[in-house]
Amino acid sequence: MKSQMYQKIEASTCHVASRKMVSNFAMKNENHLDEMIRLAFDIKHDLHVKAFWSLDLVCEKKLKQFAIYIEDFCIILPRIKDDSALRPATKIAFFLTKSNHRKNGISLTQEQEHNLIEALLDRLIQDEKVASKVYAMKALFVLGKKYN
């Protein structure tokens, strides 16, 4: 039997209202959020793109709930191939770097920062859609302030 979270992601569309509904549902329960993140990070799963669509909205509102998954995110980011999942993934990377730059934000380890830098630079070099490149450039700009 499919879980409620799975069914909501499966029924979601690319429309903002649909993605907001799924992200709000995930933020209400840590188990739902965990399931959404597991689906998003499983790049071979059919719903991984849809899960990323809503995950970027979760990270925009409540990034600290995503903090325990940063290590896995740094591993999965370079492996994402689908353009539809890449835009929200690079947007999440931007949120992480922006938060890392703040005093009371999420602290990234130096290794995590370097993994993000490497993955984001690869995205700029590769033939990707513009939206993911924009978020990659924004994130690299924020990280560049630290590494001059």
Task: Pin down the residues of each PLM region.
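Alpha-helical scaffold domains
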Residues: 1-148
